[in-house]
Amino acid sequence: MQAIQDEIKQLTDELNQHNYRYYVDDAPSIPDAEYDRLMRRLQELEAEHPELALADSPTQRVGGEALSKFNQVTHLKPMLSLDNVFSEEEFNAFYKRVGDKLPDTPAFCCEPKLDGLAVSILYRDGVFERAATRGDGTVGEDITENVRTIKSVPLRLRGSGFPPLLEVRGEVFMPKAAFEAVNDKARAKGEKLFVNPRNAAAGSLRQLDSKITASRSLAFYAYALGVVEPETWPLAASHFEQLVQLKEWGCPVSSEVKVCADIPSVLAYYQDILTRRSELAYEIDGVVLKVNDIAQQQTLGFVAKAPRWATAYKFPAQEEITQLEGVDFQVGRTGAVTPVARLQPVFVGGVTVSNATLHNADEIARLGVMIGDSVIIRRAGDVIPQVVAVVPEKRPSDAQAIQFPPQCPVCGSDVERVEGEAVARCTGGLVCEAQRKEAIKHFASRKALDIDGMGDKVVEQLIDKELVASPADLFKLTASAITMLDRMGMKSATNLVNALEAAKQTTFARFLYSLGIREVGEATAANLANYFKTLEHLKQADAETFMKVDDVGVIVAQHLVHFFEQPHNLEVIDGLLQAGVHWPDIEEVAEEALSLKGQTWVLTGTLTQLNRNDAKAKLQALGAKVAGSVSKNTDCLVAGEAAGSKLTKAQELGVKVIDEAELLAILGS
């Protein structure tokens, strides 16, 4: 038995070494026939002695039992997206922004921007443990079994020196040859074809049956380290050197990665990759540029959803000429009225395009486009088709001007366009069918009226079954009507009716927030409530008065004026008040009672005696501004249980930190 165990280990190690030479070094070390012979021998031994199979055996890539659904995974560290630049001018502006914040001129690590899907792969003690999609950057889907089938993903890291916990981030993609093979097979079976390699990779990676994923010849390139534990683990000081380290540990890295010391060399790299784009074995849509020095990256930091130290320099999208046959006006869930060009179908960038966005009235005027024109279509970012130019010499004599509608094409409400904004919007947010679902979901949400049990799916069913058309209709619902919904028995329906009754007791700030007024978030709603004290005073205000409120500028003031000018909005508000929605009066607070006025506070961790929203509201009532992140301008951090990175940053910056007990004492609870 020991001899068999030794042979299994020898075959596993030998095959993994050949995989490394093939997928990472791009230098096959044996003929395919010899590789196949070794693989068959290992499969025979493992079939006879399954208990001896090793976790990193290459036979484990064939796929396992099909899943019923993907589980969600919360990333240990957010997977942020990248900002884009589309021209040399925009790149120069990015370079200047970066250079202005650093004492030394930065070098950039440059690499092709793969047109695939970002994934996170965790290794614990060098062994593949979990893989997840990027998702929304915070929460992704567990695709462990599917990624396990990708031959270029090491199931065990090579060598030594890797940390006990290592997150490898990279891109899963489908090489062009594999894409053609998949489509050839689908074509032979009369099945639907994938339109491009990215869609094929996405469809393959999100298969519930990993055997299908295994058959699709996906590939993986690592592009960054993610979480490393312990955090003190010694790592290379540059991004390029970290990629070299990943390659030494067995993770494939693009052979096109290069460090560029200055603007000319970055631009030359961009042009070189653009020129060779069609020659590469995989689809790309630009190049990624990252400040190479890790210390400089840390100095630059992040904005809300992207690092300041990196950008994607996108390639020009593919373009074609076709005829604009008409324009439809679509109303989005936030009320944005968008002109959409109806086109004579044309094949652009791998897909047939029959519609393209015209964005807004300003863009129509800038283009000078008319119905009947021949137009140039571009797939912006290789995804969203748009009209980018008119071919004036082809304009027909019967071309017609495009008229922007003064009323919403869905509900007939006025269409407004606030000065300084490009987007025109329907003002019927509370009654417009196009916005109805989002308006009522917002109204019922936790930070608004907080209607327990009124989730998104319940709202969608209520509207689809025409039980509710506006927020006021929610309070007319009966338990018997609610039982018409899927999976809603009498007990659940009664609970929801009781929750609706309880939600009638709210606060003025929550009520204002629940109305979904454009640009009026939770903090602005609280400021409005504290300033005006009553709904009647607020409804009578003009733009000048609104602008006296903290955080209310010209645009928000105009949104408020337009909202309260619309009769249908006032009708919905009256309906809510008649249904019994109410709130306690807001008492005048003396200036000296605003003990925290001018201070910025941050909450982190779990509060056990006070929920987060109540704590925030009480701090705001004392004049504090409650922010979402810690900075040098933070006056105090409230650290609840399991406080994380915010606490660490506060301690590093010397920000005052208190616990929940101290907060309760300050609030007088």
From Swiss-Prot:
It catalyses: NAD(+) + (deoxyribonucleotide)n-3'-hydroxyl + 5'-phospho-(deoxyribonucleotide)m = (deoxyribonucleotide)n+m + AMP + beta-nicotinamide D-nucleotide. Its EC number is 6.5.1.2. Its cofactor is Mg(2+); Mn(2+). NAD(+) binds at D32, A33, E34, Y35, D36, S81, L82, E111, R134, E171, K290, K314. Residues 591-669 form the BRCT domain. It holds the Pfam family DNA_ligase_aden. Signal peptide: none annotated. The keyword Protein transport does not apply. HAMAP family: DNA_ligase_A. InterPro entries: BRCT_dom, BRCT_dom_sf, DisA/LigA_HHH, DNA_ligase, DNA_ligase_AS, DNA_ligase_CS, DNAligase_adenylation, DNAligase_N. DNA ligase that catalyzes the formation of phosphodiester linkages between 5'-phosphoryl and 3'-hydroxyl groups in double-stranded DNA using NAD as a coenzyme and as the energy source for the reaction. It is essential for DNA replication and repair of damaged DNA. It comes from Shewanella loihica (strain ATCC BAA-1088 / PV-4). GO terms for cellular component: cytosol. It is an enzyme of class 6 (ligase). This is DNA ligase. The lineage of its organism: Bacteria, Pseudomonadati, Pseudomonadota, Gammaproteobacteria, Alteromonadales. Keywords: DNA damage, DNA repair, DNA replication, Ligase, Magnesium, Manganese, Metal-binding, NAD, Zinc.
